């Protein structure tokens, strides 16, 4: 009888211990996915100064756009918390959209080979960033689901695991931008 009791306790401990390990593993997957998002955000931030310099040659009087990009880039690179990084990345995205829309007003710029190469690199980076955001959000969903269920919620409370924040698009990012060819 005693042996059964110990065996039952041992099995229960092992089964619930696996739940703790799963939460730890999922938290690490979230962190890994976030580092890939950061990697692509950094790639974008490194690419933009070259794009800005190319555009400046054609659109010197568009100082406001260049200031917006510089400020947004500085905010993104200086952000420390995940929430701040997400917010500044969305702000940076809006500034990049303004820069890209400038090319519509300057046909010579659109024809510039360096500008085209940089735009192709930016498009590739944006695609990779979209993929990494999706992977990050999927990892967050799995993790958050597990720490809200049983026995994950118990282990989350014991281990101090809290919910992770999704990478959400800024409100303006959901609207289709207007492009004018006048």
Predicted regions and their residues:
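A helix-centric hydrophobic-segment signal that preferentially recognizes long
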Residues: 2-182
């Amino acid at each position: 009888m005693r042996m059964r009791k110990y065996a039952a306790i041992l099995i229960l401990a092992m089964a619930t211990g696996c739940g703790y390990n799963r939460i730890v593993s999922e938290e690490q997957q979230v962190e890994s996915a976030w580092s890939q998002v950061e990697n692509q955000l950094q790639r974008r931030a490194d690419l933009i100064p070259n794009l800005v310099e190319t555009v400046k040659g054609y659109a010197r009087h568009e100082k406001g756009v260049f200031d917006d990009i510089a400020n947004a880039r500085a905010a993104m690179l200086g952000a420390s918390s995940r929430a701040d990084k997400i917010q500044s990345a969305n702000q940076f995205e809006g500034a990049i959209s303004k820069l890209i829309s400038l090319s519509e007003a300057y046909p010579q710029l659109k024809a510039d080979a360096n500008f085209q190469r940089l735009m192709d690199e930016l498009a590739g980076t944006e695609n990779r960033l979209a993929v990494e955001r999706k992977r990050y959000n999927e990892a967050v969903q799995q993790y958050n689901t597990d720490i809200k269920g049983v026995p994950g919620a118990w282990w989350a409370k014991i281990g101090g695991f809290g919910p992770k924040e999704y990478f959400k698009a800024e409100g303006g990012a959901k609207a289709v931008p207007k492009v004018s060819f006048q």
